[in-house]
Amino acid sequence: SKYINKDYQKVTEYLNYLYKEIDLLFEHLNKNHIELNVGTVFFGGGSPTILNREDLKKLVDKLRGLFDWSNVEFFTVESDPRRVDEDRLIYNHEICGTNRISFGMQDLDPEVQRRVNRIQPVKLFEDLLTSKVRKMYKEIAFDLLIGQPGQTLESMSKTCDEVIRLKPTLVQLSLMAYKPWVAKYQVQMLAEGPLPDFLERKELLEIIHNKLKAGGYIRTGFECYSLPGSPMTKAFDEGNAHYGASGHQTGGRVNFIAVGSSSMSNLGNDYYVQ
């Protein structure tokens, strides 16, 4: 689900409902004497960085009071580069305890960004990924979205060059799903021509694969590339990488329990809930 909103009161209302959902979940777990062994916490969605500092900390404190946090190896906050700065990333780490960032950067080509109305120049990422921030976070992930309007082999090649230069530890790929009946804003994506077709998307994926491989990245999953020595590469080498509801994961845990709008859960290979 998607909801474009600039009224923070709506965010506050959403958080109140989220807290109720969390309480219902843990009421059920406690009633059935189920104690969670949590190894990964992931704040995703559109972007949890819409939350102000106080509300993010309040949400983290809420969760810390419900289960043992000592086994949490990775705590990710998916971050919109247009909503955060270096100081906010430092706050998220030092005060809230995050140690992994995921940027839904999608594409770095200015023309593609214009056509999808998501302007985020390369300089945004340069200013965010300072040496201080890089030292604080175990993993920095970029998400590339394939099939967007205006993407060409040349533009994707340049985007890959910039990604390699920015040096995230992890690059994950996904194909854009054109569903204007769900996301009405997608209708305008066809205003200047069709989206890349199946063969064009295949060629884009080949460009990405060849570029990232030449840039030192290792393919550690069907749609996942990581740097040598990174957490994902280590997990892949040790046979502990797996694919879950939020993409490729490190560690041996296979259950993913999610809450909130558009959340996705999976319990082993038997159950999937959205």
Give each language-model segment a name.
Residues Y3-H28, L36-Q274:
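C-terminal scaffold of the Radical SAM
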